[in-house]
Amino acid sequence: MSTHFLGKVKFDEARLAEDLSTLEVAEFSSAYSDFACGKWEACVLRNRTGMQEEDIVVSHNAPALATPLSKSLPYLNELVETHFDCSAVRYTRIVRVSENACIIPHSDYLELDETFTRLHLVLDTNSGCANTEEDKIFHMGLGEIWFLDAMLPHSAACFSKTPRLHLMIDFEATAFPESFLRNVEQPVTTRDMVDPRKELTDEVIEGILGFSIIISEANYREIVSILAKLHFFYKADCRSMYDWLKEICKRRGDPALIEKTASLERFFLGHRERGEVMTY
């Protein structure tokens, strides 16, 4: 099932602003920072134990418990309890993406025995923010709730000075994400996803592959970051970055970089062990 728009929530702007102010000074976790190019952060509001320190997602089958930070955010808690089936909630996190940051194209839950159903509620966004799934690009608007098929290759980015904040909720797995909604304004028509990106020409591709002249261990991470962002501007599948990177390293003829790229693609798209962290 592909990502799609589910409905919309009308915010109490004053109460939301109070909780967002609390989050501005809250401590965000560095868990999953190896998935980020730039500043991507998360903090846990509900999890398996209710302990703030538990910031890695694991399989479990009980309703999530509120963390200490969650208890200091009364309006966000009210939003969860009013608009979602809390008995099916397994994790609730705030995800903040800052200026010129993106998530490396990846699939989620690869390290877990069971998967979840993931919904996003947009708390703060702007026109410089976008999400991608395979070859599609879309913008999640303020107050909107989206189902994200986290098993499909996807990415997210913020190309503005104002960070993007989403409330990200993992529920027990189901084929019907709409069943988790409560008191939500339902969409009347199907949302059209307009693709504003440029065409990916042969000239652009050769320019990308030109990194083969300079790529090295010293700049590998920076080149990965550039490649991860390109599909937000050109009509390409988010997975294309791995094809480009493999060809760049092949042209360079460096066995260590070729091996590193194979490991990178395996970790983000194929398989990763529980607790495994990618360094590159």
Curated annotation (Swiss-Prot):
It catalyses: L-proline + 2-oxoglutarate + O2 = cis-4-hydroxy-L-proline + succinate + CO2. It is an enzyme of class 1 (oxidoreductase). Would be one of the most promising biocatalysts for production of cis-4-hydroxy-L-proline (cis-4-Hyp), a compound which was clinically evaluated as an anticancer drug. 2-oxoglutarate binds at R164. The keyword Oxidoreductase applies. Optimum pH is 7.0. It holds the Pfam family Asp_Arg_Hydrox. Binds 1 Fe(2+) ion. GO terms for molecular function: 2-oxoglutarate-dependent dioxygenase activity; metal ion binding. Its cofactor is Fe(2+). Keywords: Dioxygenase, Iron, Metal-binding, Oxidoreductase. Dioxygenase that catalyzes the 2-oxoglutarate-dependent selective hydroxylation of free L-proline to cis-4-hydroxy-L-proline (cis-4-Hyp). Belongs to the L-proline cis-4-/cis-3-hydroxylase family. This is L-proline cis-4-hydroxylase. It comes from Rhizobium meliloti (strain 1021).
